[in-house]
């Protein structure tokens, strides 16, 4: 949760005031991102409006969604919950904000993750940009390999052509001490690059 709070702090506060804001977490798990966002939204909107109109949840894990329903009181509020593969997700909505800690490799029929050669980050970001409003924002945490200038890496071009408002390099490692990967997280505005990037941390 501390890592999520740090990330959400970089989202422009005034945008939380918009009552028409629609926020999607496409791999919501048990709702860590939306727990933090919900608390911020309570400064400006009532609970019913937030839960029934502003927050949108999606995941492919039924058990996690059942826990999420209890956390966000699905017995009292009509939550926006879908159980879909995000890559084929289509609710006919353009979102102002999409937050995500995406899976790094495809889930195989045996329940295991595929090798790193089946990295899903690129296709998740491509999908995100398709359903993100122009001028909307995405907040992602991913391994740092998207920053490589390797010939096959097209993701660095896709992301740097957009306006990265904040890029955090490797400092999130303190929250994932038992995980081998090095992480970046970033806040991106869905507009062409127009100003300098705020960078925190060091690329090694």
Per-region residue spans from a language model:
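Conserved proline-anchored active-site loop of SAM-dependent methyltransferases
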Residues: 23-38, 61, 84-113, 122-131, ...
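Short loop/edge segments at beta-strand edges and connector loops
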Residues: 81-85, 169-171
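Conserved Class I SAM-dependent methyltransferase catalytic core
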Residues: 58-67, 116-172, 185-187
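Short, glycine/charged-enriched secondary-structure capping and boundary segments
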Residues: 38-40, 70-73, 111-115, 153-156
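Flexible, glycine-/basic-rich loop-and-beta segments that form/coincide
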Residues: 178-204
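A short acidic, often aromatic-flanked loop/helix-cap motif at beta-alpha or helix-coil junctions
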Residues: 4-5, 87-90, 172-177, 204
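Class I S-adenosyl-L-methionine
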Residues: 1-76, 85
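Conserved beta-strand segments of alpha/beta enzyme cores
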Residues: 54, 78-80, 165-166
């Amino acid at each position: 949760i501390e890592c999520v709070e740090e990330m959400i702090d970089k989202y422009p506060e005034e945008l939380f005031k918009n009552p028409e804001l629609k926020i999607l977490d496409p791999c919501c798990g048990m709702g860590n991102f939306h727990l933090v966002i919900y608390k911020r939204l309570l400064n400006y909107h009532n609970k019913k409006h937030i839960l029934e109109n502003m927050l949108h949840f999606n995941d492919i894990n039924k058990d996690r969604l059942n826990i999420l329903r209890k956390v966000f009181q699905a017995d009292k509020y009509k939550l926006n919950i879908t159980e879909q593969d995000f890559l084929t997700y289509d609710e006919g909505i353009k979102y102002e904000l999409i937050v995500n800690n995406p899976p790094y490799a495809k889930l195989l029929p045996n329940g295991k993750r595929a090798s790193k050669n089946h990295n899903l980050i690129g296709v998740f970001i491509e999908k995100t940009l398709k359903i993100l409003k122009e001028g909307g924002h995405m907040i992602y945490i991913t391994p740092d390999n998207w920053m490589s200038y390797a010939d096959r890496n097209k993701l660095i071009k896709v992301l740097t052509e957009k306006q990265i408002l904040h890029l955090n390099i490797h400092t999130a490692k303190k929250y994932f001490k038992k995980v081998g990967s090095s992480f970046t997280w970033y806040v991106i505005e869905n507009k062409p690059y127009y100003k300098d990037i705020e960078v925190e941390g060091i690329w090694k």
